[in-house]
């Protein structure tokens, strides 16, 4: 399996982020072609930490090619273009093969 991970910084308006993300962005992301599953969470630090992400999203695909095709699809482009609507500070995106 192959994972696309998105890490979001703490927004200025947390309530707007959470509402928009749950009601608008996640339903879009769930339409990515080839998506096997996706999950998101609002993590908490264990002990003192200043660099804990506000939100983490993971999307699972069968392969790197499936992920690439999803991200280059019309829906993938729509999902990417939606990010500034709830996360004006952007996001960090990375991917990996699960072992």
Where is each model-derived feature located?
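Macromolecular interaction modules
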Residues: 1-99
């Amino acid at each position: 399996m192959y994972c696309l991970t998105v890490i979001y910084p703490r927004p200025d308006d947390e309530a707007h982020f959470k509402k928009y993300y749950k009601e608008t962005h996640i339903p879009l992301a769930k339409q990515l072609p080839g998506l096997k599953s996706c999950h998101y969470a609002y993590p908490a630090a264990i002990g003192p930490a200043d660099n804990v992400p506000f939100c983490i999203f993971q999307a699972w695909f069968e392969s790197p090619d499936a992920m690439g095709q999803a991200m280059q699809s019309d829906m993938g482009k729509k999902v990417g273009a939606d990010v500034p609507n709830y996360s004006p500070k952007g996001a960090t995106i990375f991917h990996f093969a699960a072992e």
